[in-house]
């Protein structure tokens, strides 16, 4: 596994990686590297105004992006009770976070994943990852490493060859502060 992690560390410095999530493969990069984020948006043919999701091994990895102090004490349990799990939350964004991640909004989409391969990857790298489905905009998302290779070829710098979590649909996306549902898991 040490060779695998070494390859992941090398690829994430400036490149795009692919890894399994709860339902599909995700394409990701280091959210702190704007060049890599732009490269990812271009590869996916995804408009920047849509924003991106960040996944993490634990909530502390999301604190550089989430304005934690803007989450009212009475809502904190609701926020944290969703994780780890297959629920992406829309939370207040910290000042200075790239608009490439937020789509220009004052919120950011984040998830503490319970899917162990993705969680282990975030733990090993020591930070959150951008997570967007591994597909060109308008096409079906890849569910295997082979499908990622088929859609993207050499454009992806490293692929974690593990299984997805087996969920039929992508994660639910909600704002727990106002109970707005952006994407249901049904």
Curated annotation (Swiss-Prot):
NCBIfam families: L-threonylcarbamoyladenylate synthase. It is found in: Cytoplasm. Keywords: ATP-binding, Cytoplasm, Nucleotide-binding, Nucleotidyltransferase, Transferase, tRNA processing. Required for the formation of a threonylcarbamoyl group on adenosine at position 37 (t(6)A37) in tRNAs that read codons beginning with adenine. Catalyzes the conversion of L-threonine, HCO(3)(-)/CO(2) and ATP to give threonylcarbamoyl-AMP (TC-AMP) as the acyladenylate intermediate, with the release of diphosphate. GO terms for cellular component: cytoplasm. Transmembrane segments: none annotated. PROSITE patterns: YRDC. One of its GO terms (molecular function) is L-threonylcarbamoyladenylate synthase. Its main location: cytoplasm. The keyword Cell wall biogenesis/degradation does not apply. HAMAP family: TsaC. It is an enzyme of class 2 (transferase). It catalyses: L-threonine + hydrogencarbonate + ATP = L-threonylcarbamoyladenylate + diphosphate + H2O. The keyword Signal does not apply. It comes from Idiomarina loihiensis (strain ATCC BAA-735 / DSM 15497 / L2-TR). It holds the Pfam family Sua5_yciO_yrdC. Belongs to the SUA5 family. TsaC subfamily. Residues 1-186 form the YrdC-like domain. One of its GO terms (biological process) is tRNA threonylcarbamoyladenosine modification. This is Threonylcarbamoyl-AMP synthase.
């Amino acid at each position: 596994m040490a060779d695998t992690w070494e390859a992941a560390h090398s690829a994430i410095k400036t490149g795009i990686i692919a890894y399994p999530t709860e339902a599909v493969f995700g394409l990701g990069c280091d959210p702190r590297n704007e060049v890599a984020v732009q490269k990812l948006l271009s590869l996916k043919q995804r408009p920047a105004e849509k924003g991106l999701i960040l996944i993490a091994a634990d909530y502390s990895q999301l604190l550089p992006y989430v304005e934690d102090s803007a989450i009212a004490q009475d809502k904190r349990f609701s926020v944290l009770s969703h994780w780890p799990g297959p629920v992406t939350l829309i939370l207040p964004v910290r000042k200075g976070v790239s608009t490439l991640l937020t789509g220009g909004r004052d919120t950011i989409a984040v998830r503490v994943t319970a899917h162990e391969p993705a969680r282990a990857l975030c733990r090993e790298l020591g930070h959150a990852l951008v997570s967007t489905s591994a597909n060109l905009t308008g096409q079906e998302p890849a569910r295997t490493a082979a499908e990622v290779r088929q859609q993207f070829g050499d454009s992806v710098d490293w692929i974690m060859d593990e299984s997805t979590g087996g969920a039929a649909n992508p994660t639910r996306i909600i704002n727990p502060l106002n109970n707005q549902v952006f994407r249901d898991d049904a």
